[in-house]
Amino acid sequence: MPVTLATFENSFVTFDDQSNKFVSDRSCGYQRDFCIPVYDGTDVSFLFTITADRTYVSPEDFTTVNARPTCEQPTIMFSNPTVIFTGVTSTDGDGNTVHYMKCYWPTPFTELQGRHGDCFVLRVVFDDGDENFVTACTNCFSYIPDKCFTTQLKYMSPDDIMGFPYSKYRFEVDWNIIRLPMWLSKPQYPKTGEYYERSNGTKQTLFARIERQYSVISDDMPEWWMKNLNIALSHDDVYVLPEDTAMSEIKVVATNDFEIQWPEMGTNAANWGRPVFELLETPFVEINNNCS
């Protein structure tokens, strides 16, 4: 059988037909281009599979190329030898070997400096050792010169959830990592508590709990980004690295409210909007308990 590459449902990085990802439009309505922002290579880590009738596959080529609707005759921007592919093998119901792979970069995209706004895709070529090659390109990315008004999102779960077969992987850490045009804002410190009133009218705190909660502000996103963002926030382990370099990585839990603000465009259809949600920092709990 030919070698095939596939990303998982609900992944921000896909090997789908680029024509329906680079331009997120419909047959009627407004047209918008959406490319995932990337500041350096550490902003991208994704999972995918390689299926073949052999147990051997190897990466023959990895390049960053100009964004096009297809992978044919690309203009190579640079080859990146620092990319790392790791994986484990399994067998599907038809006896084919399935390689569960992770792709990530341990170093920055230094070659992209000075290319502010350039759109590009990641192009990979794999060989099964018998001159059966497969070439695939991802959806598009856009280089940004700084991290302002963006946030790196990192998420994983120990079990299979929402289209991600995490149990197939045996890596030490199987993170999905992506950078999105959103940022943390307006921290609040909601408090819950219980009190009782003495006979003389004074009040005594029985229990008080204070948490830190962020509102998230975002730029426009296509519908499939917002769907995948909601799924990412539903994972067991979710971390955000805000654009503020003074802040460190924060583990968060999303509240149950995730809404989308759609643009007011009359009868014109649009499949982009802005997600509205809040994140609770964890662990961040200040407790006063006089009940014990």
Which residues make up each language-model segment?
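Preference for solvent-exposed, low-hydrophobicity sequence contexts
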Residues: M1-L153, D160
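Extracellular/virion structural assembly segments
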Residues: C137-S292
